[in-house]
């Protein structure tokens, strides 16, 4: 199958008017909104780096933002399992954590892919390392079909002997009842897929978080929170993202779990155990 050409912008007027017909013919208004939401900055960085898609793109993006990655137990990345394996991670940032994950694993295994929400699939320079699914698939047969294709693609990736990354929460972290930023329950669909894959699992924890304003918007509406995501990316300019790499969990250990809820809790706990690392 012929690959779709890389689009130089992430989101522009033509995309918006197709999504929301109300904006058709209102190019100046759309461009104003794109600037207000920092999408114009995202478009610039994408255009600046999209000629080197995939893993090199992640390095260029992080370099343009002057973001440093501080990695605990980095030697574990140099001793990843041969053949197929899975990474599981918390999802506090919604975009930069996926980009950082692809950089640190993809530099060792260039064919590494990460399952992401359809929103991130607009970053066309990242599609070589993305498998996109739709979080709202249950409400729309067409979206459900896209997500099923994504699940099949993930299974084929592992069967081909390549690594696969998951953010099992399926959405960016949010405020819990104890006023901590935390993933929601890791999704049974992803946990079932991990169990079916029967390969080692590497937990990876991201210590960063988005702004309190982003968190508040998530309480009001996930759509408002999504609109804020580009600005959150640029809020991390000149920052350090702290990442911890956990010990590889053997496939045999995963096989011991018959209950998906218990397996999900176990994998999440193994990931969040690294929260205390400073």
Q: Can you name each region flagged by the protein language model?
A:
Residues 103-106, 182-184:
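Glycine-rich, phosphate-binding/catalytic loops in enzymes
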Residues 88-90, 132-141, 174-177:
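Short, basic, glycine/proline-bearing loop/turn elements
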Residues 96-103, 189-192:
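Short amphipathic alpha-helical face segments that pack within enzyme cores
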Residues 51, 67-68, 143-148, 183-184:
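A conditional alpha-helix N-cap/helix-loop micro-motif detector
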Residues 88-91, 115-117, 167-169:
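Short His-Asn-centered micro-motif
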Residues 111-152:
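Conserved nucleotide-cofactor-binding alpha/beta core module
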Residues 1-88, 98-100, 107-111, 127-128:
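Membrane-anchoring hydrophobic helices of lipid-metabolizing enzymes
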Residues 2, 8-11, 147-278:
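Non-catalytic C-terminal accessory region of glycerolipid acyltransferases
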């Amino acid at each position: 199958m012929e690959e779709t050409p890389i689009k130089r912008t992430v989101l522009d007027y033509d995309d918006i008017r197709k999504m929301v017909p109300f904006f058709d013919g209102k190019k100046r208004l759309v461009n104003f909104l794109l600037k207000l939401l920092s999408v114009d900055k995202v478009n610039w960085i994408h255009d600046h780096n999209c000629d080197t898609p995939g893993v090199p793109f992640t390095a260029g993006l992080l370099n343009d933002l002057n973001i440093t990655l501080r990695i605990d137990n980095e030697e574990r990345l140099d001793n990843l399992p041969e053949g197929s394996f899975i990474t599981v991670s918390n999802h506090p940032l919604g975009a930069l954590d996926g980009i950082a994950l692809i950089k640190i694993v993809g530099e060792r295994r260039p064919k590494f892919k990460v399952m992401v929400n359809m929103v991130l699939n607009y970053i066309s320079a990242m599609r070589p390392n993305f498998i996109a699914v739709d979080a709202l698939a249950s409400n729309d047969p067409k979206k459900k079909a896209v997500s099923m294709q994504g699940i099949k693609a993930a299974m084929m990736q592992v069967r081909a002997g390549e690594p696969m990354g998951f953010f099992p929460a399926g959405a960016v972290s949010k405020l819990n009842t104890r006023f901590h930023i935390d993933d929601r329950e890791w999704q049974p669909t992803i946990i079932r897929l991990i169990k079916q894959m029967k390969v080692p699992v590497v937990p990876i924890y991201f210590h960063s978080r988005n702004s309190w304003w982003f968190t508040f918007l998530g309480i009001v509406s996930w759509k408002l929170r999504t609109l804020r995501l580009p600005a959150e990316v640029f809020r991390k300019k000149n920052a350090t993202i702290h990442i911890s790499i956990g010990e590889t969990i053997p496939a045999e250990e995963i096989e011991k779990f018959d209950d998906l809820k218990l397996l999900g809790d176990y994998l999440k706990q193994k990931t969040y155990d690294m929260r205390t690392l400073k």
